[in-house]
């Protein structure tokens, strides 16, 4: 019986270590389901490899972990909600959406770990732009980014 418990614990430890490597690696995505899976697995780096990806969004894609989304020169139609002290960098491509804020930044309760959005080398076309909620600590950095939106909040 002890041998069985020990094997079970070793298997759990092995799976935990394996999950660390899976979430740490950069993931290339070509399809919507791969993108959803990368977000669900809280990947630290997501690289869009499809020329145009249109996410089916009834709601915003919630990001509550640190990640870098590299559009790799491609276009993504999606909206994001960044919250709980997450740090998200979106770079190197185009974001496009209508009718919703393309990115909603929700504040963190922790002054030491604000919710952070970094935009680099992007073109953003959106009807409502970026919305920053004043419900906590936030930080937004914008570098070499063109935004065309009807409104900013």
Where are these regions (language model features)?
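Acidic Gly/Asp/Thr-rich repetitive segments characteristic of extracellular carbohydrate-active
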Residues: 26-49, 54
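Gram-positive cell-envelope targeting signals
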Residues: 1-27
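Acidic/polar low-complexity surface segments
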Residues: 150-153
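Short domain-boundary/entry signatures in modular proteins, especially
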Residues: 24-29, 72, 76-77
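Extracellular beta-strand-rich solenoid/capping regions of secreted or surface-exposed proteins
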Residues: 54-68, 75-118, 126-136
């Amino acid at each position: 019986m002890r041998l069985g418990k020990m094997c079970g614990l070793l298997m759990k430890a092995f799976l935990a270590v394996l999950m660390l490597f899976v979430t740490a690696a950069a993931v290339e995505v070509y399809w919507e389901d791969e993108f959803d899976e990368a977000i669900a697995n809280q990947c630290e780096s997501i690289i869009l490899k499809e020329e145009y990806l249109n996410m089916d969004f009834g709601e915003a894609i919630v990001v509550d972990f640190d990640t870098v989304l590299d559009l790799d020169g491609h276009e993504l139609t999606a909206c994001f909600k960044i919250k709980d002290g997450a740090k998200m960098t979106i770079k190197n491509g185009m974001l496009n959406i209508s009718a919703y804020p393309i990115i909603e930044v929700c504040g963190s309760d922790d002054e030491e770990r604000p919710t952070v959005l970094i935009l680099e080398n992007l073109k953003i076309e959106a009807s409502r732009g970026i919305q920053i909620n004043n419900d906590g600590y936030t930080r937004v950095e914008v570098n070499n980014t063109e935004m065309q939106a009807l409104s900013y909040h």
